[in-house]
Structure formats: structure tokens, C-alpha cells
Amino acid sequence: SVVKSEDFSLPAYMDRRDHPLPEVAHVKHLSASQKALKEKEKASWSSLSMDEKVELYRIKFKESFAEMNRGSNEWKTVVGGAMFFIGFTALVIMWQKHYVYGPLPQSFDKEWVAKQTKRMLDMKVNPIQGLASKWDYEKNEWKK
């Protein structure tokens, strides 16, 4: 069996808001009832019912402007996927904190930082512009 490929040199149908009138009709191969309706279209349009007018519109166009402008639900999939990956990342981080990383070193403890600061003040580290310059040694408190 031979498969006939699409001829891409011919115009193709597309519903686009920026190009509202496509060069070809939506339905390429008309059925017998659609052919009869196209013949009836050549007469007065006042003799056509509303359903026949809609059917003629659907032969030419796949979607109306309202249908083209209707929002899609794709954002729900994107938000759901993003939330899945954020949740997975949070689980990996919690696993790492529990099983991979050890306890924090003692130098992160507030008491240790206070002792280290006191030691630096006692040694008068950087007395011109640094930490020791902001400490009042006579009153034993930070300068105001």
C-alpha cells in the first residue's frame, strides 16, 4: 500500500487570530449532504435555517473567534508539574539533611560566637577601624 504524503507547497488550514481568513476551507472533502448544502448556499440565504448556516460556517472554519479566544487548561498541567518537582526537591533536601549532612559545627552556636567575640575584644583585634574600635573598654560596652 502506498501512503500519500501531504503536499506542503499548497496552503494549509490554520485557525489563527492574527490571520482570520485562511486560504483554504477547513473541510477539504465534502460529504453528499455538505455538497447539497453548498448548492443551497448559492440561493438566497434567507431560505437557510440557523443550523444550516452554522453547518456552512463549520465547513469553512473549524473554530469561531470566541472558541479561539477561549483559554486552555494547559496552565493547570504546568502548575501541577512545577508543584510536583518542587515537592520532590523538598523531599530530597529533607532526606539530605537527615542522612547526608552531619550536625552543625560548634562554631555556629550562639554561646561560641559570644565567646569568640569576647576573645577578639580582649585581643584588641583591628583597633582602628574594626571590631575593637567600636567597643568602649572603660565602660565595658559597645560605643554609641
Swiss-Prot record:
Transmembrane segments: 74-99
Superkingdom field: Eukaryota
Chief localisation class: mitochondrion
Mitochondrial intermembrane compartment segments: 100-144
Disulfide bonds: none
BP-aspect Gene Ontology terms: mitochondrial electron transport, cytochrome c to oxygen
UniProt entry tagged with the keyword Acetylation: yes
Residues bearing PTM Phosphoserine: 31, 33
Modified residue annotations for N6-succinyllysine: 4, 35
Protein location: Mitochondrion inner membrane
Keyword tags: Acetylation, Membrane, Mitochondrion, Mitochondrion inner membrane, Phosphoprotein, Transmembrane, Transmembrane helix
Membrane association type: Single-pass membrane protein
Subunit-structure text: Component of the cytochrome c oxidase (complex IV, CIV), a multisubunit enzyme composed of 14 subunits. The complex is composed of a catalytic core of 3 subunits MT-CO1, MT-CO2 and MT-CO3, encoded in the mitochondrial DNA, and 11 supernumerary subunits COX4I, COX5A, COX5B, COX6A, COX6B, COX6C, COX7A, COX7B, COX7C, COX8 and NDUFA4, which are encoded in the nuclear genome.
Protein name: Cytochrome c oxidase subunit 4 isoform 1, mitochondrial
